[in-house]
Regions:
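Generic low-complexity segments that are intrinsically disordered, proline-rich and/or Lys/Arg-biased
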Residues: 8-11, 37, 88, 100
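Short active-site loop/helix that positions an aromatic residue
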Residues: 36-49
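Catalytic cores of nucleic-acid ligases and guanylyltransferases
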Residues: 2, 33-34
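Active-site and NAD+-binding cores of ADP-ribose-processing enzymes
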Residues: 25, 47-101
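Short, flexible beta-strand-to-coil junctions
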Residues: 7-14, 34, 55-60
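ADP-ribose/NAD+-binding catalytic cleft of ART/PARP-like enzymes
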Residues: 1-28, 44
């Protein structure tokens, strides 16, 4: 059964994601969260101001909880999807911008 999850990345990746989807990282998964604001936390910590959050709909049985991120620090659970996410599985795009201090 398909379920919604969220993936965040620097906003500059929008065009590539629209064209090619979301590719797995070097560890073999696409990281996902259950809420968009949770996904943002993983990118904002790297200093990005403009962040793209992709809402995706993927098969739940292909998603597993990952334990390589601190749930206490990020205040959320993280999940890994074991395939690339094709553009048709992306249901919406959200832009987040944080003020530069």
């Amino acid at each position: 059964m398909a379920r919604k999850y969220y993936h965040a990345t620097p906003f500059e990746n929008l065009e590539s994601i629209i064209d090619q989807g979301i590719h797995r990282g070097c560890d073999g998964v696409v990281y996902l969260t259950e809420k968009p604001e949770e996904a943002v936390r993983f990118v904002v910590i790297r200093g990005y101001v403009d962040i793209l959050v992709c809402e995706v709909q993927v098969e739940e049985d292909m998603v597993e909880e990952t334990f390589d991120h601190s749930e206490a620090f990020f205040k959320c659970r993280a999940y890994g999807y074991s395939e690339d996410i094709i553009p048709d599985e992306i249901t919406s795009y959200i832009k987040y911008s944080r003020p530069v201090s």
